[in-house]
């Protein structure tokens, strides 16, 4: 898809009401600092539309990006490590749960996982929770440009396919630094 217009249209915090609209939504979710915002910037061919940081927990709101006035790409706060209190993390979790449970426009959830490491228990738990909620999450393996190709292929077969047993879709390998997306059919 050629992006002709891109706008951060809605930002929802912990107590915000979620927007009602008639466009489809695609959500991007994963552990804190997994590269969600970097991936979005790469997909959009923009350097800093979605704010990025080396500090985990930079995205603290649900951010709705309007693409060509046709759909929304939704950047969700990461789960796991962040330099915030457990209380705030619990509020984020409830905010995301509310979004997943109430958005009638959400069609797909892209679950981002760092390919350099084995998926965490929280990654697997999140994947299973999405299935229980009726979603068929598409896993995107991020940070592929930070490891060698042979290690990357080994990690897919050993770490990813073992941990995501019900997963039979296309695994996307993303290299945001080189702006390349590689497809590896399993």
List each language-model region with its residue ranges.
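Conserved G1/Walker A P-loop phosphate-binding module
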Residues: 1-86
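Canonical P-loop GTPase G-domain recognition
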Residues: 2-17, 145-186
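Short, glycine/charged-enriched secondary-structure capping and boundary segments
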Residues: 22-23, 41-44, 86-89, 124-128, ...
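Structured catalytic cores of enzymes that bind and process phosphorylated ligands/cofactors
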Residues: 26, 33-34, 40, 63, ...
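Conserved C-terminal guanine-recognition region of P-loop GTPase G domains, centered on the G4
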Residues: 71, 93-168
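Nucleotide-state-sensitive switch-loop elements of NTP-binding domains
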Residues: 79-101
